[in-house]
Amino acid sequence: MDFPRSFLYAGPQYTTRAQDVPAPLFRRKFIAPAGAQAELVITGLGFYEVWLNGAHLTKGFLAPYISAADDLIYYDRYDLTEHLLEGENVLAIELGNGFFNDPAGYVWDFDRAPWIGAPRTAFRLTLKKDGEETRIESDEQVLTHPSPILMDDYRWGEIYDARKELPGWTLPGFDDRLWAHAMPCEAPSGEARLCEAEPLAVREILKPVSIEKQDEGYLYDFGVDTTGICRVRICGHAGQKIALYHGEKLKGGKFDMDNIKFEHRYGPDDRVQRDVLILKEGENDYTPTFTYHGFRYVLVKGLEETQATEELLTMLVISSALPEVGGFDCSD
């Protein structure tokens, strides 16, 4: 397929060990006639989330897939027809760093990788009606704005400021007059290929089996060591900051991350498997977008005692959505 090579980014700045750069949002408005069909092909380096007119389309977590962009660029295809409106429509995209820029991968020298750069996207939306086609690509009409994700890294985690949320930004009619124009950027040299791998999906939802107050915070135990993220639901005050540290073991009954905090050439790293949420006033509901962790235990810092409830955290167990083709049972 002739995949578009017109890549865009919000700008050349990108997250490093010395600076955090927010995940970018993008909007592309277009007009569609009544009765049209629509198809989208899209990639995001490293990861993307995509919506049409507020409908969340992304196939699964951490789309499209992991690859070295100078060798292979995975893209996805979506049928948009059921979400298409007559008149104004909005394609909305959010980008994360993924493996395209992974400063926390310094243990493997990923912070020195030759392909490192700011997250970028390329897409083509094709409208079809009465035998005619109209192509809408990643072009100079795409607008961009920083998201509430102040920092994201595949291994570190996310910093999310709920006070910076932009209600309605994925919908037509949103006021984007203060948004900037996205900038064209270099297209990676890799071959474009449709991703046919199974998407990452939530396979199980776990509640904590115990909650214990420790010296540094509240310890949530989910009873099994697996991979995923935590959904956070909390009522608090604007500006309150809570931090979730994800670990696999205890030492002397205390939360311990020594097995995953590699020191390497930079010394100890407090950001490994840490998600930070800065609250807005009132109810907050947050799930990380561009990271995942291996853990059984979560140490939550910054909570008031009344906030350390069973409902605070839910573990979303994430893995490839492989079809079940067999099973095994045995007695004890």
What is each stretch, according to the model?
Residues M1-D332:
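Extracellular/oxidizing-compartment recognition motifs
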